[in-house]
């Protein structure tokens, strides 16, 4: 769910997601690709709601580990994990000035 996604982003990037990415207006470049891939992963899910379904995961040795028997919830966890890791891997392209723009469709 959105809360779990936010917590994963915080764990991976050290940034408060709502403040740092909630209104991040640059949907181009790497950040846009991270979000686009996440949106596409979530759109492929069947049998669970990406915004409301809760899944289990843990943080072990600085790594997110998805632990779910339900295949849809496991895939959802993996989608959220992937976007959090993508954002972490691209922190060098994060532009604080773009954090207050309105979201633009991509």
UniProtKB/Swiss-Prot annotation:
GO terms classed as biological process: arachidonate secretion; defense response to bacterium; defense response to fungus; killing of cells of another organism; lipid catabolic process; phospholipid metabolic process
Subcellular location: Secreted
Disulphide bridges, residue numbers: 28-35, 34-86, 48-72, 66-77
Site residues (Cationic membrane-docking site (MDoS)), renumbered to this chain: 15, 19, 104
Subunit: Monomer, and homodimer; non-covalently linked. Also found as trimer, tetramer, and pentamer.
Function, in words: Snake venom phospholipase A2 (PLA2) homolog that lacks enzymatic activity. Shows high myotoxin activities. Also shows neurotoxicity, since it induces muscle paralysis when tested on mouse phrenic-diaphragm preparations. Displays edema-inducing activities. Also displays antimicrobial activity against E.coli and C.albicans, as well as antitumoral activity against some human and mice cell lines. In addition, it is effective as parasiticidal agent against Leishmania infantum promastigotes and Trypanosoma cruzi epimastigotes.
Homology family: Belongs to the phospholipase A2 family. Group II subfamily. K49 sub-subfamily.
Name of protein: Basic phospholipase A2 homolog BmajPLA2-II
The organism of origin for this protein: Bothrops marajoensis (Marajo lancehead)
């Amino acid at each position: 769910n959105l809360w779990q996604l936010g917590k994963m982003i915080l764990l991976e990037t050290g940034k408060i997601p709502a403040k740092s990415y909630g209104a991040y207006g640059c949907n181009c470049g790497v950040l846009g690709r991270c979000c686009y891939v996440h949106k596409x992963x979530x759109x492929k899910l069947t049998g669970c709601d990406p915004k409301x379904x809760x899944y289990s995961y843990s943080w072990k040795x600085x790594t997110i580990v998805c632990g779910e028997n339900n295949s849809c919830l496991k895939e959802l966890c993996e989608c959220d994990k992937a976007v959090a890791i993508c954002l972490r891997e691209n922190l060098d392209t994060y532009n604080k000035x773009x954090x207050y723009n309105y979201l633009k469709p991509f």
